[in-house]
Every structure is written in C-alpha cells, then in structure tokens.
C-alpha cells in the first residue's frame, strides 16, 4: 500500500493549461464561532478539600437510631416522609453511582464524602451507593455514616433494578432543593 498515485506528465500539463489565468478569490466571509459552554474546572485542591470536609461528619463511634426491622432506611428529622416512600418505590432515578466493592473503611468514607460533595456541586438530588454483601462491614457502616451527614435527607434500600439489598439510594440536599 506504499504505492503513490502519480499523474503522468501529460495530465499535469493539461491541468496547468486548464487553470491558466485563474485568480485566487479573496476571503471576504466572516466565520462565526459558536459560543462554547463554560466548563468549570475546579482546582484539585478544592476538590480534595470538599472531599475531606464531607467525610468530616463520619464517625465510627456514633450510633444513630436506625430502623432495625425491614429494609435499611433513614429519614432526617423534619423531612417529608413521602420522600422516603418515593425512594422505596423507585420513583427517583440515581444520577451518580458509587461502588464500594473492595474498598477499605477509610477509603469508603472518603469516597462517600466525595460523592456527597459531587452531588451538591453538580446539583444532583439522588445517588446510589453499592456497598455489596461481602463480610457485611461496609453494609453495616455505610448507613451509620450516611445518617450522620447533615446533607443527607433520606436513604432507603435500593429497589432490585438498582442493586437491591446490596445498595442504598440516597437523597442529597442541594441549594435548589432547599429553596423549594
């Protein structure tokens, strides 16, 4: 495939004869550029600080009062109980997913903090955390951590299509939501 297509000299002469006397047209058209969307790039230090700030609320010693019967669920005091019902029914579709499989507790805390910070930054209301079954360490700890965070409105065991009892759907408070 290294063969180049070469015109015979007679063809080149014919072409030059045909274009003899032509003039180059001046460029007189204005090219309009489409306006670009402003992409906000957050500095890495800011993202790391948000992650640290969000994971600040998680303590391993604190034991919130969570429901022991039925599926894992939590509703922040003063929040609308109908939101929890909509979570249970699967009315909310999570926009962000976090998979904690294979993570240590420390890294899982940091990742959950980063997820909550990202939800607030991107104005995402519903997210899904997949903690898995495993040795039940993250399955037990994740709800305890989430119940401590002030930006979590509610969480409920996910419906089967989002992970069933190996995942949690959570509602994150945003500035947009607080104004409603």
UniProtKB/Swiss-Prot annotation:
Q: What is its EC number?
A: 3.1.-.-
Q: Which GO terms describe its molecular function?
A: RNA endonuclease activity; rRNA binding
The answer on whether this UniProt entry bears the keyword Zinc reads no
Q: Name the UniProt key words of this record, in alphabetical order.
A: Endonuclease, Hydrolase, Nuclease, RNA-binding, rRNA-binding
Single Gene Ontology BP annotation: rescue of stalled ribosome
Q: What class of enzyme is it?
A: hydrolase
Residue ranges of domain Smr in the record? 98-173
Q: What is this protein called?
A: Ribosome rescue factor SmrB
Which family is annotated?
Belongs to the SmrB family.
Q: What is the annotated quaternary arrangement, including any partners?
A: Associates with collided ribosomes, but not with correctly translating polysomes.
- The organism of origin for this protein: Proteus mirabilis (strain HI4320)
What InterPro entries does this protein's entry cite?
Smr_dom (IPR002625), Smr_dom_sf (IPR036063), SmrB-like (IPR022990)
Q: NCBIfam families in the record, alphabetically?
A: PRK04946.1
Record function comment: Acts as a ribosome collision sensor. Detects stalled/collided disomes (pairs of ribosomes where the leading ribosome is stalled and a second ribosome has collided with it) and endonucleolytically cleaves mRNA at the 5' boundary of the stalled ribosome. Stalled/collided disomes form a new interface (primarily via the 30S subunits) that binds SmrB. Cleaved mRNA becomes available for tmRNA ligation, leading to ribosomal subunit dissociation and rescue of stalled ribosomes.
């Amino acid at each position: 495939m290294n063969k180049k297509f070469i015109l015979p000299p007679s063809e080149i002469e014919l072409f030059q004869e045909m274009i003899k006397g032509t003039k180059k047209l001046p460029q007189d058209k204005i090219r309009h550029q489409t306006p670009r969307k402003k992409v906000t790039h957050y500095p890495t230090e800011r993202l790391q600080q948000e992650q640290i700030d969000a994971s600040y609320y998680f303590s391993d010693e604190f034991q919130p009062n969570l429901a022991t019967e039925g599926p894992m669920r939590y509703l922040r005091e003063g929040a609308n109980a109908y939101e929890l019902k909509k979570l249970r029914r699967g009315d909310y579709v999570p926009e962000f997913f976090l998979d904690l499989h294979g993570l240590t507790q420390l890294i899982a805390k940091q990742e959950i903090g980063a997820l909550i910070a990202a939800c607030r930054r991107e104005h995402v209301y519903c997210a899904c955390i997949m903690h898995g079954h495993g040795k039940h360490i993250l399955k037990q700890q994740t709800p305890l951590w989430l119940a401590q965070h002030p930006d979590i409105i509610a969480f409920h065991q996910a419906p089967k299509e989002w992970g069933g009892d190996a995942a949690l759907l959570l509602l994150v408070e945003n500035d947009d939501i607080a104004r409603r």
